[in-house]
Amino acid sequence: MLFVFILFLPSCLGYIGDFRCIQLVNSNGANVSAPSISTETVEVSQGLGTYYVLDRVYLNATLLLTGYYPVDGSKFRNLALRGTNSVSLSWFQPPYLNQFNDGIFAKVQNLKTSTPSGATAYFPTIVIGSLFGYTSYTVVIEPYNGVIMASVCQYTICQLPYTDCKPNTNGNKLIGFWHTDVKPPICVLKRNFTLNVNADAFYFHFYQHGGTFYAYYADKPSATTFLFSVYIGDILTQYYVLPFICNPTAGSTFAPRYWVTPLVKRQYLFNFNQKGVITSAVDCASSYTSEIKCKTQSMLPSTGVYELSGYTVQPVGVVYRRVANLPACNIEEWLTARSVPSPLNWERKTFQNCNFNLSSLLRYVQAESLFCNNIDASKVYGRCFGSISVDKFAVPRSRQVDLQLGNSGFLQTANYKIDTAATSCQLHYTLPKNNVTINNHNPSSWNRRYGFNDAGVFGKNQHDVVYAQQCFTVRSSYCPCAQPDIVSPCTTQTKPKSAFVNVGDHCEGLGVLEDNCGNADPHKGCICANNSFIGWSHDTCLVNDRCQIFANILLNGINSGTTCSTDLQLPNTEVVTGICVKYDLYGITGQGVFKEVKADYYNSWQTLLYDVNGNLNGFRDLTTNKTYTIRSCYSGRVSAAFHKDAPEPALLYRNINCSYVFSNNISREENPLNYFDSYLGCVVNADNRTDEALPNCDLRMGAGLCVDYSKSRRAHRSVSTGYRLTTFEPYTPMLVNDSVQSVDGLYEMQIPTNFTIGHHEEFIQTRSPKVTIDCAAFVCGDNTACRQQLVEYGSFCVNVNAILNEVNNLLDNMQLQVASALMQGVTISSRLPDGISGPIDDINFSPLLGCIGSTCAEDGNGPSAIRGRSAIEDLLFDKVKLSDVGFVEAYNNCTGGQEVRDLLCVQSFNGIKVLPPVLSESQISGYTTGATAAAMFPPWSAAAGVPFSLSVQYRINGLGVTMNVLSENQKMIASAFNNALGAIQDGFDATNSALGKIQSVVNANAEALNNLLNQLSNRFGAISASLQEILTRLEAVEAKAQIDRLINGRLTALNAYISKQLSDSTLIKVSAAQAIEKVNECVKSQTTRINFCGNGNHILSLVQNAPYGLYFIHFSYVPISFTTANVSPGLCISGDRGLAPKAGYFVQDDGEWKFTGSSYYYPEPITDKNSVIMSSCAVNYTKAPEVFLNTSIPNPPDFKEELDKWFKNQTSIAPDLSLDFEKLNVTLLDLTYEMNRIQDAIKKLNESYINLKEVGTYEMYVKWPWYVWLLIGLAGVAVCVLLFFICCCTGCGSCCFKKCGNCCDEYGGHQDSIVIHNISSHED
């Protein structure tokens, strides 16, 4: 929505009667026509509309620059308004009040020759701003006395601003009549610039970027030069050309012109000469020719075929839309309000349809931290939301840790629950203590019902923050005064129930000490003292004299709505139609092609149109109220055949027909001169002459097609662009067969002529188990001398483990590569039904992809298979659990949920009639009704009391039986427990005796073992002496040599194993690479290689996981019959030009040379599609080198000689190892008596097993469904009606008898006799 100056901002703009502004009496309400559209277009070829980049000079360069430029070929709008002595109120609103967006380019006419003598302004003033009030900056470009006065100030614009060509009229010394400021306003720029007053027109270039405003100027139709730039830090949203008030000179025509066209961010190609002057410019997205120039970065591109991607495929512009001039949300004002709630009564406020600046907000409240949940904090800046809700409260100093996500402290369990599933940000900030008053309020209604008072319970400390430690919920029947010793009207009592707070809820109530509740006067209700409310605590919020506050910012509807952050907000841009652009429409992003349409199906609150698939299909611009359709950008290839002598190229939209090209605005040309469909796609700007053939072609389009251009054809035929699409045939087939010779002779070859479907299964190993080795343990075991000498081998063991780790890493990397190849682009599916019967099973691909989804842990026997009553039944029924000694379940099975069968399902227990002791509400009502009826109308209704009597008696029997079983079980438990205690005591005695005997024997053996150890020490001392003698006799060199020999042998074996591991890993690496290659070439695509994916020509391949590898199933067609043909590797035409076949052979067929494919014999004529032209018929020969492997075997020395070299005689002295076994005391224990006693105790414990009578627990539902209540209600109504007429007819209701009138008179005699009969019968 566009904002008109005074109509929407009366507090900011000039007021009526201000001597600096025009009076309303000098205005009128005449309508004004729309701005005129120029016939002149923006011609950027000479640099018009461009500008010299600040602080940069380019010499003799052609380069691409991205900036804010007009669209080449766009038109101007004249926004100048002329007045004499009055202005029109309609001048100050759209379409003359416009959106500034990225910027504007203006061409302004110099009116010096038309203005009266003494005039100081030769063109209107332009103002650029947002609110045009004293709180925002406004850019003013105003002419005065041959200079340009540029100012950026916080002006207050008049209600009816204008530019006067002679401001000194009537003694008014003001420069301009457009602002009301008496005192100088706040300015960031005020400068004057020289103006060439003799120029025909002035050219201005205004744009904004990153909060900075840029102004450029020129006095001739060329590139503009830098005027000034100023950082404003805000977005300028609109501009206005002030009306030009002037009385022209006599006889002159006065028509001010202020031509304006919008700027957009686009790419231009510039050419700079040796002086750094722009000599030519090209808008890269304006035409196909300009796109080719930008692609080649040349103003004169050469002849060729170019693949276009900038304009037709990739977005080349941006359409950005936000609702303009929304009010500020003022979230910071609410966050910094003096009254701050406690966690117990946290507050929420929702903001919608407004803007906020998150950076300013954080600075304003002096934020300490900001953490976001389910969204990156950086993504909040610049986003739009449906609405924003903010919850805040003061934080007790000791409970800050409770506000961490997932914490279960007091603040989150009993005060405020943070919703971890919501998109939100948690803000911690502080306020000075003098600006904060804590509002401690208990929101509980049931606490206040019994006398809760905030100040009386919590106190009045300004910075104490109250929080609940536990919350309680109560039923409506709860009364804390229901005690026998307290006078109170309470008659029933239910206990409070502890509860946690849910998301968005407050604490339901604090705990109550019921002993402190009561009232001497029962008519004044139940009142609790202040000290009776418990379960809360308090702490100060102050840290360093600042109160800590928590705010939870809930972000609702991300990327939708009109509640936007202005931190990274861009200015609105023009809606560019007909090209592929990126768009951001009120937070909805994407890319597409816009086309303006007339649509009446948008409601006033609707802006976006979607299709049935949820894709954005249309858009209504709130700024201009125009409607657009949005089509997807063309994602194919566009080939442009460009000839340097032609003004435009011929186009080929590959793989797409022309109807789609023009219906989706892919082409820039709405009505091209000519176009047609070919088998390559849509051809534009060329004639269809594919029936003609050319031997030479400069613009080859592929597939044997050529674009030919002729300047003469374009000149003589006005309906032709000069391009034509023809067939490219570099030679004539008949000429080939007349003068052709085979290159390098003829060869016989068998070529397939018939095929069958083949099936091939293949396993490729891609991984193996990992191996690690403890090198020292493998070589030396636990031998210390060996380990010491092994150190001399250096890093051999370290290298072993390094090699094994390298092998393991290699296996891991190959496994990741294989998994990546499988997961990218492999569509896994089962075999489709094909009507072929037979034992063919679907392939199970689940091991390949693993378990996906929430059904992984569920099966038919899992949680999903559990069955029970429905949720509706659980809602309509209450559950009651009964002790069942054997008849409750049988009773329930008999009734089947029909409570009227109560007495029909009486059970028998040990000969006694019993019923379950619990009755539902409906059963109680029924039996009560029967008992009441029996008491009211005896003896006729006495029978109605029989069911009640029987029910009571049977249920009393049920209670008695249950109590009897429980009593018998209690006696059995007591008896068995006593027996068990006796047996346990006896078992402990026997165990104590046995342990005594064991102790004496163990002590004796310990002494004997001590003697044995002394003897062993002596013997092993002798052994050590002998070994020492042996080592002394052996030379140190010989001992090391023996150890070294063993180490060498084992290291050799280990080295061989490591070599084998390396070799195996190399094989696995090769096979894994082959598996990846087969996945990519066989599974994801169809290969042309023979016998690579199965046997024969590949059709289809499937892959499945297997232990340590992949299992492939290939389908291919295998040749079953062949023909023998004479083939040639090439042909020589006329002895100077050669031909080579493409993916096939040249064969002789009936004496004529033809081409056939290598996989199937099918002779066809030789064309450029199946052959390649060579410059000569020469053949190059290469001889392969002769390389042979070395087959010599090494000759090692004789083994016996090497053994004798190291063998030495050894002598050993055996030590005396005899032991004195006589000193060992071998004692046998006799524990038979103690074991028997323990066995008896165990037997008694076993006999104490309690065989209790089974008492089950049965769960029954006691509430009837709604339809049963309906039937009971209808029956009750019927009974009441019946009783009413009985009372009338028997005279029992005299009042009713009088009201019935004549209705009952005719039965009066009969009624009296019945009454007398009843009385007499009763008296008898």
Curated annotation (Swiss-Prot):
Region annotated Fusion peptide 2, chain positions: 889-909
S-S bonds: C21-C158, C153-C187, C165-C246, C284-C294, C329-C354, C372-C425, C384-C564, C894-C905
Protein family according to the UniProt entry: Belongs to the betacoronaviruses spike protein family.
Start and end residues of each stretch annotated as Heptad repeat 2: 1214-1254
Keyword vocabulary terms for this entry: Coiled coil, Disulfide bond, Fusion of virus membrane with host endosomal membrane, Fusion of virus membrane with host membrane, Glycoprotein, Host cell membrane, Host membrane, Host-virus interaction, Lipoprotein, Membrane, Palmitate, Signal, Transmembrane, Transmembrane helix, Viral attachment to host cell, Viral envelope protein, Viral penetration into host cytoplasm, Virion, Virulence, Virus entry into host cell
Listed name of the protein: Spike glycoprotein
GO cellular component, one term: host cell Golgi apparatus
Sites where a glycan is attached: 31, 60, 192, 357, 435, 530, 625, 657, 665, 688, 737, 754, 893, 1180, 1190, 1209, 1225, 1246
BetaCoV S1-CTD domain span: 327-566
Extracellular topological domain: 14-1265
Signal peptide: 1-13
Effect of Q159L: In strain: Isolate C12 mutant; associated with altered pathogenesis
Location of this chain's protein in the cell: Virion membrane; Host endoplasmic reticulum-Golgi intermediate compartment membrane; Host cell membrane
Gene: S
Coiled-coil region: 999-1043, 1227-1255
Motif residue range(s): KxHxx: 1320-1324
Outcome recorded upon mutating N98S: In strain: Isolate C12 mutant
Site (Cleavage): R717, S718, R869, S870
